[in-house]
Amino acid sequence: MTRPPIIETRGLSKTFGGLVALDEVALQVEEGSITALIGPNGAGKTTLFNCLTGIYPPTRGRIIFRRPRDSETGPPLKTTLNDLRPDQITALGLARTFQNIRLFNNLTVLENVLIGCHPRMKAGLWGALMRTRRARAEERDMAEFSMLLLEKYGLGAAANDLAKNLPYGDQRRLEIIRALATGPRLLLLDEPAAGLNIAETNALDELIRLIRERENLSILLIEHDMTLVMSVSEKVWVMEYGRLIAAGAPGEIKNDPVVIRAYLGEG
């Protein structure tokens, strides 16, 4: 049975001067799925992520995010993300990681995750500055929540270590955990296996599956490691020159001559 999309784009285009980075992209991510987006370098994959998360405003088209119902019988709520700021999009339940790790290297592992909790906090700037009772209670709750996340996903013992002292694979893991701290319903992973060795990539495969199972969320990942893509994904979308050229199950994509010519057969 086809699940409803948690996010979809309709005719999404992005231009930079005369350069067309995205050209009428119509993509869907089914709720609860692990979906991959692949394509050669320069295909427009990260530009698409940047549009989904509010970093780039689309030139044309729509980005529609499906929110939870107000009640069990009510219709699903749909929000157009086009004109929202990145923080507003995060608050709706969309989080991402980046191809280049963006940790606070001189903060501890726990402090990095606490920063990810910021969108969940309700006390506001005034409460934080004045150290109100509510703000202090929230800080305690978020510290406990952050520690639980670290323990759940294998970094509990490193909570007080500086982020820069973690092995590279654990830095990738920390960035994903920090994204989870925002409380997402959709997690975007931009080349999470970049720079990982085989053992670290296998651990990442396990982590992605575990997160989907435990957190009941949807995952969209950009990835060049085709072994990981074929292992973990339920559906694969393929981009080339800013356009979607194929979509299907991993086995279908692997044997699609258009995809082989455009991407899988490179080199």
Regions found by a protein language model. Name each.
Residues 2-267:
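Glycine-rich phosphate-binding loops of nucleotide-dependent enzymes
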